[in-house]
Amino acid sequence: MLPAANIGDLFLIGTGGFIGASLRYTISSRMPKIRSIPAGTLTVNFLGSIVLSLLTFSSEPESVVYLVNIGILGSFTTFSTFAYETFKLLEDGQNVSFFLNIFLNVILCLLGVGIAYFALRL
């Protein structure tokens, strides 16, 4: 477990949060929906799963964990947006897209973790 954060750690987390949120907006705003599925959220969650796993499995120093894992990737990936967009699909009566979005997010993010895990074992 990581120790309590000091001001330097909080600065790294905040800086990373700014970078991650900016990247998420940039990617998500340029991705079209595919069959009503919010591809931007799916893309950032998939990419974030890969990068987070690569860093976690390779035991990076705490400063990298604060900046990248917690800061950048914490604001880059987004479970709350995924939940809202998925619920909106259900509310709009797009039942197939609702289930497909859940399936794709879970499977692709797990696949991303697996890719990172096995890539570091090569």
Curated annotation (Swiss-Prot):
Keywords: Cell membrane, Ion channel, Ion transport, Membrane, Metal-binding, Sodium, Transmembrane, Transmembrane helix, Transport. Pfam families: CRCB. Na(+) is not transported, but it plays an essential structural role and its presence is essential for fluoride channel function. It catalyses: fluoride(in) = fluoride(out). It is found in: Cell membrane. GO terms for biological process: cellular detoxification of fluoride. GO terms for molecular function: fluoride channel activity; metal ion binding. The keyword Transmembrane applies. It comes from the Archaea. The chain crosses the membrane at residues 1-21, 37-57, 64-84, 98-118. It is a multi-pass membrane protein. Na(+) binds at residues 74, 77. The keyword Hydrolase does not apply. GO terms for cellular component: plasma membrane. Fluoride-specific ion channel. Important for reducing fluoride concentration in the cell, thus reducing its toxicity. This is Fluoride-specific ion channel FluC 1. The gene is fluC1.
